[in-house]
Amino acid sequence: MKKQKSIDKHQLKDGLQSDIKAKLMEMKSQLKEEDEKRQKREKAEQIRKKKEIEKNKSFEELLNESQMDWHQYK
C-alpha cells in the first residue's frame, strides 16, 4: 500500500513537470515571437524617421553631403 502511494506521487510529479515544461516552452515561443515583432516595428520606425529626415534636408545640407566637387561647375 505504501509502495503504491509512492508510485502515485511519482507519476503525479512527472505529469506536473511535463505540463509545466510545456507551458514554459509555449511562453518562451510567445515571448520570442513578440520580441521579433517589436524589433520589426522598431526597425520600420527607424527607417521611417531616416526617410523623413532625408526628405526635410535643406539644399545646403544635401550639397555638403554630396561627394561631387561643386566648384568644378561654378
Curated annotation (Swiss-Prot):
Pfam assignment, any one = DUF3886
Q: Where is this region: Disordered?
A: 1-74
InterPro entries the UniProt entry points to: DUF3886
Top-rank taxon of the source lineage equals Bacteria
Residue spans with biased composition (Basic and acidic residues)? 1-13, 20-60
Ranges annotated as biased composition (Polar residues): 64-74
Kindly provide the name given to this protein in its UniProt entry: Uncharacterized protein YqkE
Supply the source organism for this entry.
Bacillus subtilis (strain 168)
Q: Which gene encodes it?
A: yqkE
